[in-house]
């Protein structure tokens, strides 16, 4: 590991946030006038931050503050705002000094006033929102809209210029930053980590992003841990451990930690400027060495530990209680200003302490000499195109997916691992797009049968290597497959990669995709809002392959059996969510090609990796996937008739069992007219008024009939189908089978039997719902029950399914 050079230090064991600056890096790079100007910009940021939380009117305090000038409902988070603004304005200096591209991610996104303020002051906000002008009238609107109905949210939402990270749900800032830095060699991603955020599991793991950045081809992430000491009502852990332990912690993680601590503003400006000069210089040294001499060892990237008081520059005390430097600064330090004249005066004094009359002219325009501290054009962090990644996005150069399909003579006769041809297809997608496409997986790419991608690019690895790694390890410092056993970190990397204009693909085990439930939620919400913003350019969809599915987790057992992620996806906006359940290889390839070309969606593809029957030729698969739902004529015998029964399914295993049930019924009752319907696009079941992919009632009724019994065999939890189809005319005759939380170490057929998605249960269900078979079907039901019992007993004795069931083929 490359070590950092020895440096002088003025650090002590003091872990308090007050006093003159204490810093690892010594120096005074700023002149007195520069310190004064930097502090004036800082005062302006803090003034705006307080104004956003409190003010409805009187934005420049041209008259004494009155209750009617104050918002009726006070919302926002003051405590983190000064630290964020301090980082932002010092990064502006770095951008100008080094002509360096930087984007800014605020982990504690609830401190949005500290980000919105400098974005407004640099001019980016008014450029995107001309109605929020750079004068008193615009400032009044800017204050009013914050955390206000009809305005903007209280975090770094998609409406925030320069934001790719909302920071509402904490823990993802470093993984988002890493994704943004991938394949952006000239970019520094400044990622402010809140010390409360640092206690979350995703953040604690994501410190390891420094092992996944290649300085020869990637940009850099500069983590800035803001130790302001408190969460909502508790001290933070990292702010209360001994200084040496904290430094050792980050050194052990492979960083070069640079401390900047204190509250005295002039000395803090000097310390932060010197520290950022060191960090940028060090980053450039690491990158130059790797790009000129090759990457030989794991770099030790710099990071900053910024210890400042929570609510820095705010009221020291309120009503006899400490505020600045305590948890009371977290949200709204003065909450009763409408009714308490003393606190109203405190608020006015607080606002006037920033001396706004020195910062804005008589029209309310920010002083030009102070605005000049910020960069211009696209160097402004609010206008950097990397933070509006769709502006930089290029379509993938796609191979012809048809060339990766399989051929066969008859449907339902041969078995193929569904995901293996997909791996070959993805291999060539990666070959065609060596700088803007990556694959992510939590140690499962080979397990999920996608290992053909290693023919195009290995797994990225720059930590220590052993000789045995060469034997199938597939490791390389040039690799573009990212594997780490943290779904959180991988999902964050992918999101950051997509939001900065690139493309990606993530595969994971179905049961453990739940690890990123809430991350999916947040990303879907982000996309939903972006769709409403004309200035946000389209980004590539998040493509998620769910494999190692519930019905083939018979060997791992109950803990690995959970298809409920689909329920989570269905909770999100129909504008951004898509769910596909391709039943075989050719349909999976068609779906994958479609998803990789799409924009602004979360595409969830459910496909198992094991051997499965193949049903559709490539031409048939393309047509079927284009429609999303359809009758398989070769599996039906109702041609020219009203069907007696509709058998439907969604998912590979449910499809096999549904077809086997049809075969049982047709063998017992040759006159029975059965229509088989396969669903690839799950949202086809919803009405078109609820989802853009939904079928019209006319088309749904044409397929599923108005009054015939429907047996629907579903991959997931059965109630999801009822939820999607409850408005349909024939819902009363819809009977759904799916996973019912009945699992253990089973055989595949036994697991299906336990949850009643097996062929025997489906055939019995059909008989029970056909009045004409109530008498004639009794013997068949007994036969099917006997076969079911025999199948289970065989599994108990031999540990596998009977070959006639495990290698069943379509008999017609």
From Swiss-Prot:
What InterPro entries does this protein map onto? Phosphoketolase, THDP-binding, Transketo_C/PFOR_II, Xul5P/Fru6P_PKetolase, Xul5P/Fru6P_PKetolase_C, Xul5P/Fru6P_PKetolase_CS, Xul5P/Fru6P_PKetolase_N, Xul5P/Fru6P_PKetolase_ThDP_BS
Keyword Magnesium carried by entry: no
The cofactor named in the record is: thiamine diphosphate
Does the keyword section mention Lyase?
yes
Question: Per the record, a Pfam family?
Answer: XFP_N
Q: Spell out the NCBIfam families in the cross-references.
A: PRK05261.1-2, PRK05261.1-4
The family annotation for this protein states: Belongs to the XFP family.
Q: What is this protein called?
A: Probable phosphoketolase
The upper taxonomy is: Bacteria, Bacillati, Cyanobacteriota, Cyanophyceae, Acaryochloridales
């Amino acid at each position: 590991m490359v070590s950092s050079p020895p440096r002088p230090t003025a650090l002590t064991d003091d872990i308090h946030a007050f006093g003159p600056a204490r810093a690892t890096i010594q120096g005074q790079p700023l002149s007195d006038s520069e310190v004064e100007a930097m502090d004036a910009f800082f005062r302006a940021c803090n003034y705006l931050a307080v104004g956003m939380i409190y003010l409805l009117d009187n934005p420049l305090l041209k008259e004494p503050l009155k209750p009617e000038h104050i918002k009726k409902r006070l919302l926002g988070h003051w405590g983190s705002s000064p630290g964020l603004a301090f980082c932002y304005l010092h990064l502006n200096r770095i951008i100008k000094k080094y002509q360096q591209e930087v984007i800014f991610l605020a982990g504690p996104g609830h401190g949005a006033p500290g980000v919105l303020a400098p974005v407004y002051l640099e001019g980016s906000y008014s450029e995107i929102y001309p109605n929020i002008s750079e004068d008193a009238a615009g400032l009044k609107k800017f204050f009013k809209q914050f955390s206000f109905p009809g305005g903007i949210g209280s975090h770094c939402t998609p409406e925030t210029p320069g934001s790719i990270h909302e920071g509402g749900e904490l823990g993802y800032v470093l993984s988002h930053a890493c994704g943004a830095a991938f394949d952006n060699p000239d970019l520094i991603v400044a990622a402010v980590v809140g010390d409360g955020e640092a206690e979350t599991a995703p953040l604690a793991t994501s410190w390891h992003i420094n092992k996944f950045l290649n300085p020869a081809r990637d940009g850099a992430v500069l983590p800035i841990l803001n130790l302001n000491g408190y969460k909502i009502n508790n001290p933070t852990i990292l702010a209360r451990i001994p200084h040496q332990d904290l430094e050792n912690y980050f050194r052990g993680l492979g960083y070069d930690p640079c401390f900047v601590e204190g509250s005295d503003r002039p000395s803090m400006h000097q310390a932060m400027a010197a520290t950022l000069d060191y960090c940028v210089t060090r980053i450039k040294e690491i990158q130059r060495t790797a790009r000129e001499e090759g990457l030989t060892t794991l770099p030790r990237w710099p990071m900053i530990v910024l210890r400042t008081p929570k609510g820095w520059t705010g009221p020291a005390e309120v009503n006899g209680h400490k505020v600045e430097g305590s948890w009371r600064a977290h949200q709204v330090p003065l909450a009763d200003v409408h009714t308490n004249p003393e606190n109203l005066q405190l608020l006015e004094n607080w606002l006037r302490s920033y001396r706004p009359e020195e910062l804005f002219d008589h029209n309310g325009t920010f002083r030009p000499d102070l605005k000049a501290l910020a960069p211009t054009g696209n160097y402004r962090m609010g206008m950097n195109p990397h933070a509006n990644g769709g502006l930089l996005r290029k379509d993938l150069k796609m191979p012809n997916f048809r060339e990766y399909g399989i051929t066969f003579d008859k449907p339902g006769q041969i078995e193929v691992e569904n995901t293996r041809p997909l791996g070959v297809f993805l291999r060539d997608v990666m070959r065609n797009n060596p700088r803007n496409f990556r694959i992510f997986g939590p140690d499962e790419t080979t397990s999920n049968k996608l290992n053909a991608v290693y023919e195009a690019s290995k797994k990225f690895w720059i930590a220590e290597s052993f000789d045995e790694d060469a034997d199938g390890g597939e490791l390389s410092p040039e690799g573009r497959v990212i594997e780490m056993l943290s779904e959180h970190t991988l999902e964050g990397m992918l999101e950051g990669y997509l939001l900065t204009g690139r493309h990606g693909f993530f595969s994971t085990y179905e049961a453990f995709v739940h690890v990123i439930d809430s991350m999916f939620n947040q990303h879907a919400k982000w996309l939903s809002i972006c769709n409403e913003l004309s200035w946000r350019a389209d980004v590539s969809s998040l493509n998620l392959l769910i494999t190692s599915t519930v019905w083939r987790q018979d060997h791992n057992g109950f803990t690995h059996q959970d298809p409920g992620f689909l329920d989570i996806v269905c909770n999100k906006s129909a504008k951004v969510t898509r769910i596909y359940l391709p039943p075989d290889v050719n349909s999976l390839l068609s779906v994958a090609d479609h998803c990789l070309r799409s924009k602004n969606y979360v595409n969830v593809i459910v496909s198992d990796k094991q051997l499965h029957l193949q049903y559709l030729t490539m031409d048939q698969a393309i047509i079927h996937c284009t429609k999303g739902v359809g009758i398989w004529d070769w599996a039906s015998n109702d041609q020219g008739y009203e069907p007696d029964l509709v058998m439907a399914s969604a998912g590979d295993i449910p499809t096999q069992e549904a077809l086997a049930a049809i075969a049982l019924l047709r063998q017992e009752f040759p006159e029975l007219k059965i229509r088989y319907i396969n669903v690839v696009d799950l949202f086809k079941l919803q009405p078109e008024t609820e989802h853009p992919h939904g079928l019209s009632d006319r088309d749904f009724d044409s397929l599923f009939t108005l009054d015939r019994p429907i047996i629907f065999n579903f991959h997931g939890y059965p109630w999801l189908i009822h939820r999607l189809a409850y408005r349909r005319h024939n819902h009363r005759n819809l009977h759904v089978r799916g996973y019912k939380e009945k699992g253990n170490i089973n055989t595949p057929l036994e697991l299906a039997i336990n949850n009643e998605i097996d062929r025997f249960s489906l055939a019995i269900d059909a008989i029970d719902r056909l009045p004409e078979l109530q008498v004639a079907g009794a013997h068949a039901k007994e036969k099917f029950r006997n076969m079911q019992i025999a199948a289970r007993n065989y599994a108990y004795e031999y540990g596998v399914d009977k070959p006639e069931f495990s290698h069943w083929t379509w008999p017609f």
